[in-house]
């Protein structure tokens, strides 16, 4: 919205108005969206948590077959803390992003839609006091429909460059120089799998205090930089990246994700006063997945978000192996609970997973030069 004001003033010949002139700089708007999102999330935190406690009563149900100490330590903790993140994310993005940018609206649309889906899941769990909310099939069908619509919108309406003809339906491979495969309209399915899959991967990771949100912020930082670089024709040319017109604006959204995440972590730090819930995890995973699709770095997301991928794979492997043999590979899935069963303290698991996520973000950035 503030960018609209700057745009209106600049068209009227008033582009040099102090302070507002700063809005033409993407880096400034990214920083301001981060700060704004943080302030919004922190400011609403205490009252929102008290309200959630009053409304939810017993709070988020804890798995009875899980880690024994969690049943005692985490009982009564409210969920739906994702609302705090999303409030900051949307306020920061709407204030400082260019709202004429189709990439911004696609990412915000995915984020909001998945947030609503997550809220419905959290609401069902809290009201029924069960760890089973919406069925997996219900969530997946909704996620795929939304993701398919988003992919179609990008293919049809996203700005195109004469030098990137066909890029909107192509998969760009990292490291392997100039290896690009045009999937045609099959790309819609690929994009939907990327968005929905990563959304669920983040959801599965959100099982310990602070575990998911910090890796989400690492990934958002990485993809904010990637979006900034591939959206700038000079930087893209220098780094031999495929230029994606106008996608740099997503750096502002990534800044808002980071700021909202920091504000939420203020209250989610151990011992957590509130859980993110599916309201936050499904939305943030969808946001990162859609940003990767917009920036044409879907495969790099598998590296940067490798921690989330590993968590999801551990569940898939556990379920498949158990169905076939009646035995379990891991003591408990997702894999962070496996390490708890091995005797690792919760804080040890969380911090070590943060380290892994940070290193994977660096590896993902390194692929920009390994071409």
Swiss-Prot record:
Catalyzes the initial step of the lipid cycle reactions in the biosynthesis of the cell wall peptidoglycan: transfers peptidoglycan precursor phospho-MurNAc-pentapeptide from UDP-MurNAc-pentapeptide onto the lipid carrier undecaprenyl phosphate, yielding undecaprenyl-pyrophosphoryl-MurNAc-pentapeptide, known as lipid I. Its main location: membrane. It is found in: Cell inner membrane. Pathway: Cell wall biogenesis; peptidoglycan biosynthesis. It comes from Caulobacter sp. (strain K31). The chain crosses the membrane at residues 25-45, 79-99, 104-124, 139-159, 179-199, 210-230, 247-267, 274-294, 299-319, 348-368. GO terms for molecular function: metal ion binding; phospho-N-acetylmuramoyl-pentapeptide-transferase activity; UDP-N-acetylmuramoyl-L-alanyl-D-glutamyl-meso-2,6-diaminopimelyl-D-alanyl-D-alanine:undecaprenyl-phosphate transferase activity. This is Phospho-N-acetylmuramoyl-pentapeptide-transferase. Belongs to the glycosyltransferase 4 family. MraY subfamily. It is a multi-pass membrane protein. Its EC number is 2.7.8.13. GO terms for biological process: cell division; cell wall organization; peptidoglycan biosynthetic process; regulation of cell shape. Its cofactor is Mg(2+). Keywords: Cell cycle, Cell division, Cell inner membrane, Cell membrane, Cell shape, Cell wall biogenesis/degradation, Magnesium, Membrane, Metal-binding, Peptidoglycan synthesis, Transferase, Transmembrane, Transmembrane helix. GO terms for cellular component: plasma membrane.
